[in-house]
Amino acid sequence: MANSLNSMNSVAEILEALPAEETQHMLRVGRLVDLFTRKLQSYSLVKERFDERNNFGSAAFYHDIGKAWIPLGILTKPDRLTEQEMHVIRKHPVFAQRLFDQIRLGLISGIPGHLIQLAADSAMYHHEWWNGTGYLYGISYDAIPLIARITTVCDAYDAMTSSRIYRESHSHDHARQELKQYAGIQFDPELVRVFLAADVGSAFFSDALLSHL
Protein backbone atom coordinates (compact mmCIF):
# COMPACT_ATOMS: atom_id res chain seq x y z
CA MET A 1 0.00 0.00 0.00
CA ALA A 2 1.11 3.59 -0.55
CA ASN A 3 0.37 4.44 3.07
CA SER A 4 -0.85 2.92 6.31
CA LEU A 5 -3.87 4.19 8.19
CA ASN A 6 -1.88 3.74 11.39
CA SER A 7 0.75 6.25 10.27
CA MET A 8 -1.62 9.16 9.62
CA ASN A 9 -3.70 11.18 12.04
CA SER A 10 -5.42 13.68 9.75
CA VAL A 11 -7.17 13.88 6.42
CA ALA A 12 -4.71 16.61 5.41
CA GLU A 13 -1.85 14.09 5.66
CA ILE A 14 -3.82 11.62 3.58
CA LEU A 15 -4.53 14.17 0.85
CA GLU A 16 -0.84 15.10 0.73
CA ALA A 17 -0.06 11.47 -0.11
CA LEU A 18 -2.05 11.69 -3.34
CA PRO A 19 -0.54 12.81 -6.66
CA ALA A 20 -1.51 16.35 -7.71
CA GLU A 21 -3.50 14.99 -10.67
CA GLU A 22 -5.73 13.05 -8.28
CA THR A 23 -6.41 15.95 -5.92
CA GLN A 24 -7.10 18.26 -8.88
CA HIS A 25 -9.62 15.72 -10.18
CA MET A 26 -11.22 15.56 -6.73
CA LEU A 27 -11.52 19.35 -6.63
CA ARG A 28 -13.10 19.48 -10.08
CA VAL A 29 -15.58 16.75 -9.24
CA GLY A 30 -16.54 18.51 -6.00
CA ARG A 31 -17.18 21.75 -7.87
CA LEU A 32 -19.07 19.94 -10.62
CA VAL A 33 -21.25 18.16 -8.05
CA ASP A 34 -22.00 21.50 -6.40
CA LEU A 35 -23.05 23.04 -9.72
CA PHE A 36 -25.05 19.98 -10.75
CA THR A 37 -26.86 19.82 -7.40
CA ARG A 38 -27.95 23.43 -7.78
CA LYS A 39 -29.31 22.59 -11.23
CA LEU A 40 -31.12 19.57 -9.78
CA GLN A 41 -32.73 21.77 -7.15
CA SER A 42 -34.17 23.96 -9.88
CA TYR A 43 -35.62 20.80 -11.47
CA SER A 44 -37.03 19.78 -8.05
CA LEU A 45 -35.21 16.45 -8.20
CA VAL A 46 -33.23 16.82 -4.98
CA LYS A 47 -35.42 15.93 -2.01
CA GLU A 48 -32.73 15.88 0.68
CA ARG A 49 -32.87 18.50 3.42
CA PHE A 50 -31.77 21.93 2.19
CA ASP A 51 -28.71 22.08 4.46
CA GLU A 52 -27.61 18.60 3.43
CA ARG A 53 -27.86 19.04 -0.31
CA ASN A 54 -25.93 22.30 -0.10
CA ASN A 55 -23.06 20.21 1.24
CA PHE A 56 -23.00 17.71 -1.63
CA GLY A 57 -20.12 19.42 -3.46
CA SER A 58 -17.95 19.73 -0.36
CA ALA A 59 -18.59 16.09 0.54
CA ALA A 60 -18.04 14.78 -3.00
CA PHE A 61 -14.53 16.25 -2.99
CA TYR A 62 -13.52 13.25 -0.87
CA HIS A 63 -14.84 10.66 -3.33
CA ASP A 64 -11.40 9.35 -4.32
CA ILE A 65 -9.65 9.71 -0.97
CA GLY A 66 -9.31 5.93 -0.77
CA LYS A 67 -6.73 6.12 -3.56
CA ALA A 68 -4.19 7.29 -0.98
CA TRP A 69 -3.71 3.56 -0.26
CA ILE A 70 -3.11 2.63 -3.89
CA PRO A 71 0.58 2.29 -4.84
CA LEU A 72 1.89 5.44 -6.51
CA GLY A 73 3.35 3.33 -9.29
CA ILE A 74 -0.20 2.44 -10.32
CA LEU A 75 -1.69 5.91 -9.84
CA THR A 76 1.06 7.56 -11.89
CA LYS A 77 1.62 4.84 -14.50
CA PRO A 78 1.96 6.52 -17.93
CA ASP A 79 0.38 3.58 -19.77
CA ARG A 80 -2.98 1.90 -19.55
CA LEU A 81 -3.36 -0.27 -16.47
CA THR A 82 -3.32 -4.04 -16.63
CA GLU A 83 -6.33 -6.01 -15.40
CA GLN A 84 -4.41 -6.86 -12.22
CA GLU A 85 -3.66 -3.18 -11.62
CA MET A 86 -7.30 -2.30 -12.26
CA HIS A 87 -8.23 -4.87 -9.61
CA VAL A 88 -6.04 -2.96 -7.15
CA ILE A 89 -7.55 0.40 -8.18
CA ARG A 90 -11.05 -0.97 -7.62
CA LYS A 91 -10.21 -1.47 -3.95
CA HIS A 92 -10.15 2.27 -3.22
CA PRO A 93 -13.78 2.35 -1.98
CA VAL A 94 -12.81 -0.32 0.58
CA PHE A 95 -9.95 1.83 1.82
CA ALA A 96 -12.34 4.77 1.99
CA GLN A 97 -14.75 2.73 4.11
CA ARG A 98 -11.94 1.86 6.53
CA LEU A 99 -10.90 5.50 6.68
CA PHE A 100 -14.39 6.70 7.53
CA ASP A 101 -14.66 4.01 10.20
CA GLN A 102 -11.52 5.52 11.76
CA ILE A 103 -12.91 9.03 11.41
CA ARG A 104 -16.12 8.05 13.20
CA LEU A 105 -14.03 6.57 16.02
CA GLY A 106 -12.19 9.87 16.35
CA LEU A 107 -8.85 8.33 15.37
CA ILE A 108 -8.45 10.52 12.28
CA SER A 109 -9.53 14.15 12.07
CA GLY A 110 -10.07 16.71 9.36
CA ILE A 111 -13.56 16.25 7.89
CA PRO A 112 -16.31 18.39 9.48
CA GLY A 113 -18.90 16.30 11.29
CA HIS A 114 -21.80 17.40 9.09
CA LEU A 115 -19.95 16.12 5.99
CA ILE A 116 -18.85 12.71 7.25
CA GLN A 117 -21.87 10.61 6.20
CA LEU A 118 -22.24 12.33 2.83
CA ALA A 119 -18.51 12.07 2.12
CA ALA A 120 -18.52 8.40 3.11
CA ASP A 121 -21.46 7.67 0.80
CA SER A 122 -19.75 9.44 -2.09
CA ALA A 123 -16.43 7.67 -1.53
CA MET A 124 -17.84 4.19 -0.94
CA TYR A 125 -20.55 4.02 -3.60
CA HIS A 126 -19.56 6.20 -6.58
CA HIS A 127 -18.55 3.14 -8.62
CA GLU A 128 -21.89 1.42 -8.18
CA TRP A 129 -23.87 1.23 -11.40
CA TRP A 130 -27.55 2.04 -11.74
CA ASN A 131 -28.23 -1.50 -13.02
CA GLY A 132 -26.31 -3.17 -10.17
CA THR A 133 -23.23 -4.28 -12.12
CA GLY A 134 -20.77 -1.83 -10.55
CA TYR A 135 -18.43 -2.39 -7.64
CA LEU A 136 -17.95 -3.07 -4.76
CA TYR A 137 -21.33 -3.84 -3.27
CA GLY A 138 -23.47 -4.51 -6.34
CA ILE A 139 -26.32 -2.28 -5.19
CA SER A 140 -28.63 -0.65 -7.71
CA TYR A 141 -31.23 2.02 -8.39
CA ASP A 142 -32.33 4.11 -5.39
CA ALA A 143 -30.37 1.87 -3.00
CA ILE A 144 -27.34 3.85 -4.16
CA PRO A 145 -27.23 7.07 -2.10
CA LEU A 146 -28.18 10.13 -4.12
CA ILE A 147 -24.84 11.85 -3.55
CA ALA A 148 -23.07 8.78 -4.93
CA ARG A 149 -25.29 8.71 -8.03
CA ILE A 150 -24.57 12.40 -8.62
CA THR A 151 -20.85 11.86 -8.02
CA THR A 152 -20.84 8.97 -10.51
CA VAL A 153 -22.08 11.22 -13.31
CA CYS A 154 -19.71 14.06 -12.46
CA ASP A 155 -16.73 11.75 -11.92
CA ALA A 156 -17.24 10.14 -15.33
CA TYR A 157 -17.72 13.49 -17.04
CA ASP A 158 -14.53 14.92 -15.55
CA ALA A 159 -12.55 11.76 -16.29
CA MET A 160 -13.57 11.95 -19.94
CA THR A 161 -12.99 15.68 -20.43
CA SER A 162 -9.67 15.90 -18.57
CA SER A 163 -6.27 14.78 -19.83
CA ARG A 164 -4.94 11.64 -18.22
CA ILE A 165 -1.36 10.46 -17.95
CA TYR A 166 -1.99 7.90 -20.71
CA ARG A 167 -4.36 9.83 -23.03
CA GLU A 168 -5.62 13.22 -24.16
CA SER A 169 -8.96 14.60 -23.00
CA HIS A 170 -12.18 13.83 -24.87
CA SER A 171 -14.51 16.55 -26.11
CA HIS A 172 -17.56 17.82 -24.27
CA ASP A 173 -19.77 16.35 -27.02
CA HIS A 174 -18.09 12.95 -26.68
CA ALA A 175 -18.71 12.98 -22.93
CA ARG A 176 -22.36 13.91 -23.45
CA GLN A 177 -22.80 11.00 -25.86
CA GLU A 178 -21.20 8.58 -23.39
CA LEU A 179 -23.47 9.74 -20.58
CA LYS A 180 -26.49 9.34 -22.84
CA GLN A 181 -25.38 5.88 -23.99
CA TYR A 182 -24.91 4.59 -20.43
CA ALA A 183 -27.98 6.24 -18.89
CA GLY A 184 -30.01 3.49 -17.26
CA ILE A 185 -26.95 1.22 -17.24
CA GLN A 186 -24.15 2.96 -15.37
CA PHE A 187 -25.93 6.19 -14.55
CA ASP A 188 -29.26 7.21 -13.02
CA PRO A 189 -31.19 8.08 -16.22
CA GLU A 190 -33.05 10.98 -14.61
CA LEU A 191 -29.79 12.55 -13.45
CA VAL A 192 -28.32 12.21 -16.93
CA ARG A 193 -31.43 13.80 -18.42
CA VAL A 194 -31.00 16.89 -16.24
CA PHE A 195 -27.20 16.99 -16.67
CA LEU A 196 -27.66 17.12 -20.44
CA ALA A 197 -30.73 19.37 -20.48
CA ALA A 198 -29.10 21.92 -18.18
CA ASP A 199 -25.80 21.55 -20.07
CA VAL A 200 -23.96 21.31 -16.76
CA GLY A 201 -20.67 20.50 -18.46
CA SER A 202 -20.61 23.70 -20.51
CA ALA A 203 -21.67 25.74 -17.49
CA PHE A 204 -18.85 24.17 -15.47
CA PHE A 205 -16.26 25.02 -18.12
CA SER A 206 -17.59 28.59 -18.31
CA ASP A 207 -17.31 28.97 -14.53
CA ALA A 208 -13.78 27.55 -14.61
CA LEU A 209 -12.71 29.96 -17.33
CA LEU A 210 -14.19 32.96 -15.52
CA SER A 211 -12.42 31.97 -12.30
CA HIS A 212 -9.07 32.21 -14.10
CA LEU A 213 -9.66 35.66 -15.61
Where are these regions (language model features)?
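Histidine- and acidic-residue-rich, metal-dependent catalytic cores
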Residues: 2-213
